[in-house]
């Protein structure tokens, strides 16, 4: 100890990194260094500096245990995504895109991005593309179809702009074994369809999704598009890990997903899909992909996600603040669907227990995400009080600076898969941190406004109740008649073992 006392060196306060939950967790306090030589400090202060600054921090030890638990699950998720492998192409495929695939595109737009997307779909050689729109948009979309490929693109209409009714209308006019739903801005690589069809070689698979990346609207990504790209990169890891761990996925994204036509032709599905109500009162228009995913689980069908460059689609996001309205709509849909999966339908518990765990985690995530800054604020407050009056030894600025450094380091680590391909986006990490806290507050707001079922980002979306009533009354304006669906007998719905 004499050598230590006589030598100019550094001293440090050491605090345990803890947090209740979050991904990855942030600490309450941190290693805080002071570069003052020890020979300039009193003996009393040396003793204080060379021990753990305990004060009342032992009350947070249980939170540290939970934080360790969260780190462990984060590493498990990363490890599972690394060992995940996409299904390879079969030597003798059962399904050929030119014979077995119909692409259904519900839309009310006819912009330049739609034409680019249509060309990318045709590069995969599907048998047919069915565009379903409202009556007022038939002319512009028919012109677009004629300009791209009138032989393989067919335009149908419904009386009101309603995505679920548009999808159902397309299903009724499909004659192939596989349906692929696509957003009007989803741009595919030419290899996407073969890799998606490879999953259907397993007769237990009913739905297939893909990984995704953001396609910038302009020459450079805006901060909103970068935030969306961060979210998609994290999602790609999550869906790859859940697919590898228990074969499940919280949602087959509606941007592009493929299904067996025989499942969607079921009258029970079509009725439930177009008559979906929250709490029996509020009819749902968005959240179609959530409904489809839950239907796969509740009816014993397996799902798979092809996370690979060969099947990775590009999708545009709102390049401005309207991205937040998109996120709000998605968040409401997630609340509704997850609560149904966990507490009403309950098939997810036995079919995909890991996915059920992730859903439970999301229920508590907004609260636990806000615990960190709240506890840091408490420590900062205690640091402004004299020690004799029960305050803490650490200076308040030290706590804030250390917390900021910790958040930046952990969030950057979480985004490394994205930054590996786009290192220039590292400057947006602070924006991602702020967005995380905004998102936590927004999730709580979404929870208390689940009765709001509007689209939020698109004008012209019809009232779902009125649109459904028109469809039920047979008021749809049908396009050219299609031959009846040729039911393939090799498809047999697997038995539902989880009931």
Question: What residues fall within each predicted segment?
Answer:
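N-terminal membrane-anchoring/stem segments of glycan-assembly enzymes
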Residues: 2-97, 246, 417, 439-443, ...
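Membrane-interface segments at the starts/ends of alpha-helical transmembrane spans
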Residues: 46-59, 351-358, 390-393
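Compositionally biased, charge-rich terminal segments
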Residues: 46-48, 52, 208-221, 408-427
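Membrane-embedded multi-pass helical conduit in multi-pass membrane proteins
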Residues: 57, 63, 72, 79-87, ...
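Short hydrophobic helices that act as membrane-entry/anchoring signals
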Residues: 70-73, 77, 81, 225-232, ...
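Non-transmembrane catalytic domains and loops of membrane-associated enzymes and transporters
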Residues: 93-349, 477-499
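Multipass alpha-helical transmembrane domains of eukaryotic endomembrane proteins
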Residues: 330-332, 340-364, 409, 413-416
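Membrane-interface alpha-helices
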Residues: 447-473
């Amino acid at each position: 100890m004499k050598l230590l006392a006589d030598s100019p060196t550094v001293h440090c306060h050491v605090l345990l990194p803890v947090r209740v939950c979050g991904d990855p967790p942030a600490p309450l306090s941190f290693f805080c260094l002071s570069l003052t030589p020890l020979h300039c400090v009193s003996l009393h202060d040396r003793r204080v500096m060379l021990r753990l600054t305990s004060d009342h921090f032992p009350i947070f030890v249980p939170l540290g245990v939970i934080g360790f638990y969260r780190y462990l699950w984060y590493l498990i998720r990363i490890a599972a995504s690394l060992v995940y492998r996409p299904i390879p192409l079969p030597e003798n495929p059962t399904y050929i895109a030119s014979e077995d695939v119909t692409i259904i595109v519900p839309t009310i737009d006819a912009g330049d991005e739609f034409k680019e997307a249509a060309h990318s779909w045709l590069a995969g050689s599907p048998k047919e593309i069915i565009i379903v729109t409202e009556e007022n948009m038939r002319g512009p979309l028919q012109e677009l179809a004629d300009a791209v490929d009138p032989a393989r693109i067919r335009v149908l209409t419904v009386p009101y702009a309603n995505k679920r009714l548009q999808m159902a209308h397309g299903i009724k006019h499909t004659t192939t074994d596989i349906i692929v739903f696509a957003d009007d801005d989803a741009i595919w690589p030419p290899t996407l369809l073969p890799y998606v069809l490879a999953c259907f070689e397993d007769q237990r698979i009913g739905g297939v999704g893909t990984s995704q990346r953001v396609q910038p609207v302009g020459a450079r990504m805006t901060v909103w598009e970068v935030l969306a790209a961060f979210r998609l990169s994290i999602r790609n890891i999550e869906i790859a890990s859940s697919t590898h761990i228990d074969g499940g996925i919280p949602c087959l994204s509606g941007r592009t997903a493929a299904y067996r036509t025989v499942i969607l032709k079921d009258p029970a599905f079509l009725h439930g899909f177009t008559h979906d109500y929250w709490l029996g009162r509020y009819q749902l228009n968005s959240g179609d992909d959530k409904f489809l995913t839950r239907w796969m689980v509740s009816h014993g069908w397996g799902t798979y996600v092809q996370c690979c460059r060969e099947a990775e689609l590009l999708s545009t996001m709102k390049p401005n603040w309207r991205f937040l309205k998109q996120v709000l709509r998605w968040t409401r849909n997630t609340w509704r669907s997850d609560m149904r999966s966990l507490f009403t339908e309950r098939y997810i518990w036995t079919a995909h227990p890991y996915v059920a765990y992730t859903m439970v985690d999301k229920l508590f995530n907004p609260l636990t995400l806000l615990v960190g800054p709240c506890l840091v604020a408490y420590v900062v407050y205690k640091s402004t009080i004299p020690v004799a009056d029960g305050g803490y030894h650490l200076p308040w600025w030290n706590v804030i600076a250390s917390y900021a450094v910790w958040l930046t380091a952990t969030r950057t680590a979480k985004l490394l898969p994205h930054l590996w391909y786009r290192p220039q986006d590292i400057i947006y990490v602070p924006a991602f941190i702020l967005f995380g806290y905004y998102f936590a507050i927004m999730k709580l707001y979404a929870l208390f406004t689940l009765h709001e079922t509007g689209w939020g980002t698109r004008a012209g979306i019809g009232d779902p109740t009125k649109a459904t009533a028109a469809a039920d009354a047979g008021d749809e304006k049908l396009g050219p008649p299609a031959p009846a669906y040729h039911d393939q007998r090799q498809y047999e719905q697997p038995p539902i073992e989880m009931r």
